[in-house]
Amino acid sequence: MSFIDPYQHIIVEHHYSHKFTVVVLRATKVTKGTFGDMLDTPDPYVELFISSTPDSRKRTRHFNNDINPVWNETFEFILDPNQENILEITLMDANYVMDETLGTTTFPISSMKVGEKKQVPFIFNQVTEMILEMSLEVCSSPDLRFSMALCDQEKAFRQQRKENIKENMKKLLGPKNSEGLHSTRDVPVVAILGSGGGFRAMVGFSGVMKALYESGILDCATYIAGLSGSTWYMSTLYSHPDFPEKGPEEINKELMKNVSHNPLLLLTPQKIKRYVESLWRKKSSGQPVTFTDIFGMLIGETLIHNRMNTTLSSLKEKVNTGQCPLPLFTCLHVKPDVSELMFADWVEFSPFEIGMAKYGTFMAPDLFGSKFFMGTVVKKYEENPLHFLMGVWGSAFSILFNRVLGVSGSQSKGSTMEEELENITAKHIVSNDSSDSDDESQGPKGTEHEEAEREYQNDNQASWVQRMLMALVSDSALFNTREGRAGKVHNFMLGLNLNTSYPMSPLRDFTMQESLDEDELDAAVADPDEFEQIYEPLDVKSKKIHVVDSGLTFNLPYPLILRPQRGVDLIISFDFSARPSDSSPPFKELLLAEKWAKMNKLPFPKIDPYVFDREGLKECYVFKPKNPDVEKDCPTIIHFVLANINFRKYKAPGVPRETNEEKEIADFDIFDDPESPFSTFNFQYPNQAFKRLHDLMYFNTLNNIDVIKNAIVESIEYRRQNPSRCSVSLSSVEARRFFNKEFLSKPTA
């Protein structure tokens, strides 16, 4: 049964760009002047330049010794119609050393009307005539999707997944507990969340996923969302050719073998040369390269070394029939001069789309990193491999890469890696350099002759590769500074008009109109300035943006799951975040997520941190809406923490440990162990350490399966009592109309 999606009727404001097409047809009587023609016959080509647009400089091929060349070459420019756009046309003569300018003229594009197409002659040096054919049209089909709604692919996935989940829940819960599942509308949306925490999070999440897979809970989940270390496990699992036919158990054995090696083995001269040459190809194509690219390669070589060409788009085959939960990954967009706790835009990644819900702006995964202007691709690159994204999602570790490898002795005494990571701010990792400019707008007119250009490029490549090799194998500034370590990509929102950002819950803003406790919002969880600037927009004039590890703001990927469009009923979160000790309260990240949700007017159950004082440390805690009749959209949260409690006594739920060996293997601390085998920055896990952490989280999850099942049963009943959940109602339509009127009546900047 289909229903109306109210979010698809909310208009995300954007201006259309113009596409200006130039066909360089021909020229006659090309001359270098009387004296010049006596010495040499021209080798002409044409260069086109529009300073107001990215990818602004284009050129034709050149013809040797031809004074009447016929090029018939077509070029396209994407223009902002609100700017003054001038086409600069330069006739060039190709030479071996340096090309010569034969003449330059300009054409005001504003003199053309939309829909007009005409041929225009241009005269150079009173003799040469060049004919260009030009046309101007509106780009009515941008490459970005502007919408508050989920994409059609995700909607189709959800429908298919619900059909599967309906049968899976009946099997999991039995006839009595699943009698409320009459149709797919009764199926609750269950999401699984994994936190950051380096390899500790990855290994712990591997045990969790094994338990969820074997217990049948995974078959009942619609989403699985990860951050930093958890995304590495998700990437490993979903990119594996045998998943889901082969379960996590076999894949986890491969993972244990892969992480048992010293990461320094990845830095052999032969491997480094291969990494750097690959990065050179990326850099020379016009894409930014940072240390995060290198870190992504190292993570990829460790975890998915036999599938380094895998892309995010290719993971669609794992979910195209709803056979697996949809994986969601995340990073942050940050500003160079603002703490990420104050300002950060959450970027979400799925096999279907990448984008920022805050701006209602999304793109196909293969376009991430391409050069955009006003929502249209002006230069497309190959899709970034999955390992590059893995480096971005966990880029906090590239920031302190010297600590990861243990190659620097410069760290301050008494400083733990966790403490050092907590002190990182955006200004430490984002270089405010001048490389934001485009090469084509900076370079002089003309280029060297092709042979000279190749020679120059080869020399430049050799020099760049040599510098990178020296930086990686020596104790250089690259290891000892943090600036420039953040991931960097072309700004896909360049040139858009952002008069305002959009609320994460647009319909809720106007239908609920509930009063928020200002004292609650002002209370600091980790920092007095946390989330102070989260309503501010991205800089649409910056040609590149910095993307970093989401754990630098808070370490749980709740923003992906709390989007009201996803209508999640039950969230099962697993927090592997570092704590001062095993006995420390485990709610810091969850409290930050709660505050973020309230500031964005998103429903979130009240997190009572004093439950720790009353009940002590437990394997999991359940948080429900206090007034379910009023908080109809509020999810239930089952929050698992990293704690070794019952695992010390039981080798399986209800099965006591008996032998000394069984007791000894389970007698360990996570954060109080002085040798820190589970440190956030430990990137080598011996088999015993892997098995301990993996088996601990496997046990903790299975030990609380009944808690999860009971929550699913309650969610089914909750759905049955609230059939209008996430579907349209009269109040929603009115809210949508009010929303459009409120936000679209504002004057443009």
Swiss-Prot record:
Domain C2 as annotated: residue spans: 6-122
Positions of the UniProt region annotated as Phospholipid binding: 1-178
Tissue expression profile of the protein: Detected in granulosa cells after stimulation with chorionic gonadotropin (at protein level).
GO BP terms: arachidonate metabolic process; glycerol metabolic process; glycerophospholipid catabolic process; leukotriene biosynthetic process; monoacylglycerol biosynthetic process; phosphatidylcholine catabolic process; phosphatidylglycerol catabolic process; prostaglandin biosynthetic process
Domain of life: Eukaryota
Swiss-Prot/TrEMBL keywords: Calcium, Cytoplasm, Fatty acid biosynthesis, Fatty acid metabolism, Glycerol metabolism, Golgi apparatus, Hydrolase, Isopeptide bond, Leukotriene biosynthesis, Lipid biosynthesis, Lipid degradation, Lipid metabolism, Lipid-binding, Membrane, Metal-binding, Nucleus, Phospholipid degradation, Phospholipid metabolism, Phosphoprotein, Prostaglandin biosynthesis, Prostaglandin metabolism, Ubl conjugation
Placement of covalent cross-link Glycyl lysine isopeptide (Lys-Gly) (interchain with G-Cter in SUMO2): 541, 606
Known partners and oligomeric status: Interacts with KAT5.
Domain note: The N-terminal C2 domain associates with lipid membranes upon calcium binding. It modulates enzyme activity by presenting the active site to its substrate in response to elevations of cytosolic calcium. In the presence of phosphoinositides, regulates phospholipase A2 and lysophospholipase activities in a calcium-independent way.
Protein's name according to its UniProt entry: Cytosolic phospholipase A2
Gene field: PLA2G4A
